[in-house]
Amino acid sequence: MLDHPLNSLGFAKPPSATRVVVAMSGGVDSSVVAAELAADGYDVVGVTLQLYDHGAALAKKGACCAGRDIHDARRVAETMGFPHYVLDYENTFREAVIDEFADAYLAGATPVPCIRCNERVKFKDLLQTAKDLDADCMATGHYIQRKMGAAGPELHCAADAARDQSYFLFSTTREQLDYLRFPLGHLASKAETRALAARHGLPVADKPDSQDICFVPNGNYAAVIEKLRPGAADPGEIVDLAGNVLGAHRGVIHYTIGQRRGLGIGGLGDPLFVVRLDPERRQVIVGPREALSTRIVPVREINWLGDAPLTSQAEWQVMAKVRSTRAPREAVIRPISDTEAEVELIAPEDGVSPGQACVFHVPGDSRILGGGWIWRGR
């Protein structure tokens, strides 16, 4: 008997015999993934994670994971005729994401909780749940591509650079990548996604995209931290690089590296920027723009996705992205261990902040080689 040709998810069996768990946030992206797979005849199981207390504080436009999102995901499942489950992951989410978020700000870092959520909740616990449900794979609505290479599946940027989410998925491991599918990664624009939603008659076709961190109402992260860590907003001094006191601040957690506005120290001549935070002394250190310039970026907790081990070479020529909103820049990785390295930026970058990710791209290619966490800069 001839082998069955590979289906669109890469399995040698018909779609009807291929079970796929779809991580459904209630937004248009994951809804389209579920609808397309269901329409193609796959055995789809929708799963939505309840990650936070979905009270009035979060029942608003622009936040994911809110109460209405669970309702919307369920409506999509009903429209397309596949089962849908809601799993309570609030305790896991608090321990794996929210607590570290608060502690990072207290340590003077600027965290990216969405990366930790993907790494520690969605692509860990939810992925295991998918396996427990005997699913062949798990699909998400992320804009990123999974391509087969000579050494196995590779992570690649989305076809639509404006929607690319590779920065937030750098910590996806090889084992996870083997099990995951990203059906939207090849689309040229978000308009295509919404057109597919309309074609399937999905109730979320015109739903606004999520913008905020799901557990931070109205973007007021400082209020969340103060609630979690009383005393976190204790006031202190704003000082210059020489230690001269220029003013007072309302809590280190209100400031980020590179910040210029809202310092309350105008009239001092040249513009001043936050160049460092010292939580132990409760000081915000400011200086001229050139003081923000960083070339050497120590990176740890590296997830390396190259074909050869990270330490197999003394140097790697890459393109490095140090913030989600910035373009990758030429850089050299000098490994210290399998999970730690020094990254030299060929051209200095302003505002490199501890707590952000440094993501590695193959020069001239869409492939992602992984990345790590910035823990200090010089």
Swiss-Prot record:
The record marks H142, Q356 as: Interaction with tRNA. It comes from the Bacteria. The keyword Aminoacyl-tRNA synthetase does not apply. Keywords: ATP-binding, Cytoplasm, Disulfide bond, Nucleotide-binding, RNA-binding, Transferase, tRNA processing, tRNA-binding. Residues 163-165 are annotated as: Interaction with tRNA. It catalyses: S-sulfanyl-L-cysteinyl-[protein] + uridine(34) in tRNA + AH2 + ATP = 2-thiouridine(34) in tRNA + L-cysteinyl-[protein] + A + AMP + diphosphate + H(+). The active site is at C117, C214. One of its GO terms (molecular function) is tRNA binding. It is found in: Cytoplasm. Signal peptide: none annotated. GO terms for biological process: tRNA wobble position uridine thiolation. SUPFAM superfamilies: Adenine nucleotide alpha hydrolases-like (SSF52402). InterPro entries: MnmA-like (IPR004506), MnmA-like_C (IPR046885), MnmA-like_central (IPR046884), MnmA-like_central_sf (IPR023382), Rossmann-like_a/b/a_fold (IPR014729). Its EC number is 2.8.1.13. ATP binds at A23, M24, S25, G26, G27, V28, D29, S30, L49, G141. It holds the Pfam family tRNA_Me_trans_C. One of its GO terms (cellular component) is cytoplasm. Belongs to the MnmA/TRMU family. Catalyzes the 2-thiolation of uridine at the wobble position (U34) of tRNA, leading to the formation of s(2)U34. This is tRNA-specific 2-thiouridylase MnmA. It comes from Cereibacter sphaeroides (strain ATCC 17025 / ATH 2.4.3).
